[in-house]
Amino acid sequence: MKNWIKVAVAAIALSAATVQAATEVKVGMSGRYFPFTFVKQDKLQGFEVDMWDEIGKRNDYKIEYVTANFSGLFGLLETGRIDTISNQITMTDARKAKYLFADPYVVDGAQITVRKGNDSIQGVEDLAGKTVAVNLGSNFEQLLRDYDKDGKINIKTYDTGIEHDVALGRADAFIMDRLSALELIKKTGLPLQLAGEPFETIQNAWPFVDNEKGRKLQAEVNKALAEMRADGTVEKISVKWFGADITK
């Protein structure tokens, strides 16, 4: 009888520990992608942080934010040191074949940005022979290579600082999503301008590893996201950071 009680107590303790562990969610981000994720006065904040704070409340998650260079985030995800990446991750075919994704939560466009006064670049076709900066490991690097079949564009990768090299004339243009480019120009005051319209529409979502925990998180996050859309919370967070609903 005593042995049975010990086994039952141990099983209950193990079950409780499992439930507790499942509510701990580590969210990876760069902390350098204004206004999605950035640090101000030693506080991590932004659109992504507000979204996950709300998801955490609704799903009773204990959220831990893990910051790293963007180029290292997928490595952290694959080795289990984080549970997802919240850094405007575009759903490419290659990524969808490798990871589970929550439902898209941002719709945006791939945008060329140049030094102010440079009107010679208006689209991808004008980038031949030019040096174009992209963030290392971002989907924009591969997207640009897909357009540059003949290898005529000098694609230069950076961990950070692509906007400064374009402003200083060290690179002719950089590629990032249109929303971030607009906010970056507004925030930094650097002599930059958008070049033409976005050359590709993109949908961004949170990736998870395809395992038991990843599938559980995907379902729970999708449920919370749907509720947040329905009650206006997603729109409210979006308007706070962008002045418009960027999620549809």
UniProtKB/Swiss-Prot annotation:
Q: Which InterPro entries did the record assign?
A: Iontro_rcpt_C, SBP_3_CS, Solute-binding_3/MltF_N
Q: Which SMART domains match?
A: PBPb, PBPe
Q: Name the UniProt key words of this record, in alphabetical order.
A: Amino-acid transport, Periplasm, Signal, Transport
Gene Ontology molecular function: any one: ligand-gated monoatomic ion channel activity
This protein's GO CC annotations: membrane; periplasmic space
Positions the record marks as coiled coil are none
Cite the Pfam families for this sequence. SBP_bac_3
Which PROSITE patterns does the record associate with it?
SBP_BACTERIAL_3
Q: Where this protein primarily resides, as one coarse class?
A: periplasm
State whether keyword Methyltransferase applies: no
Subcellular localization, per the record? Answer: Periplasm
Tell me one GO biological process term: amino acid transport
Q: Which residues form the signal peptide?
A: 1-21
What is the role of this chain? Probably part of a binding-protein-dependent transport system for an amino acid.
Family membership, please give it. Belongs to the bacterial solute-binding protein 3 family.
> Could you tell me what this protein is called?
Putative amino-acid ABC transporter-binding protein PatH
Instruction: Give the source species.
Output: Vibrio harveyi
